[in-house]
Amino acid sequence: MHDAELVLKCWGGVEADFEGTGGEVLTRLFKQHPETQKLFPKFVGIASNELAGNAAVKAHGATVLKKLGELLKARGDHAAILKPLATTHANTHKIALNNFRLITEVLVKVMAEKAGLDAGGQSALRRVMDVVIGDIDTYYKEIGFAG
């Protein structure tokens, strides 16, 4: 079974609450790695204790998870999805690759807790994200961004 399939087995729980789960992912990312909150200008002024209930954080978290869902459902054939995302994250947002690694670990933990992603699924999600991050790195190099 393809790694994406293992993760998608639990994806229904994520889709049922994109905002709640996405808000949890970003809230944990920002609390565990406060430097990442500074990468989102609209979230800079939000106090740590106000992140979880913030509508904008939840909405952006939902956007992140919906894009991840597209990538998973593409089952590795994701160039058309990933190249524009990599381009904006390089040229507009200036997001270094390590930040994708940080959010991967948060995603793994939140999906384990909220969607029942088991140990095999967690390993599969890490492998999927390793491929995605490797491809982002390739696109970054193509456009001259030292991410």
Swiss-Prot record:
The keyword Membrane does not apply. Residues 2-141 form the Globin domain. It is an enzyme of class 1 (oxidoreductase). Its EC number is 1.7.-.-, 1.11.1.-. Heme b binds at H89. GO terms for biological process: removal of superoxide radicals. Nitrite binds at H60. PROSITE patterns: GLOBIN. InterPro entries: Globin, Globin-like_sf, Myoglobin. It catalyses: Fe(III)-heme b-[protein] + nitric oxide + H2O = Fe(II)-heme b-[protein] + nitrite + 2 H(+); H2O2 + AH2 = A + 2 H2O. GO terms for cellular component: extracellular exosome; sarcoplasm. O2 binds at H60. Keywords: Cytoplasm, Heme, Iron, Metal-binding, Muscle protein, Oxidoreductase, Oxygen transport, Transport. GO terms for molecular function: heme binding; metal ion binding; nitrite reductase activity; oxygen binding; oxygen carrier activity; peroxidase activity. PANTHER family: MYOGLOBIN. Monomeric heme protein which primary function is to store oxygen and facilitate its diffusion within muscle tissues. Reversibly binds oxygen through a pentacoordinated heme iron and enables its timely and efficient release as needed during periods of heightened demand. Depending on the oxidative conditions of tissues and cells, and in addition to its ability to bind oxygen, it also has a nitrite reductase activity whereby it regulates the production of bioactive nitric oxide. Monomeric. This is Myoglobin. The gene is mb.
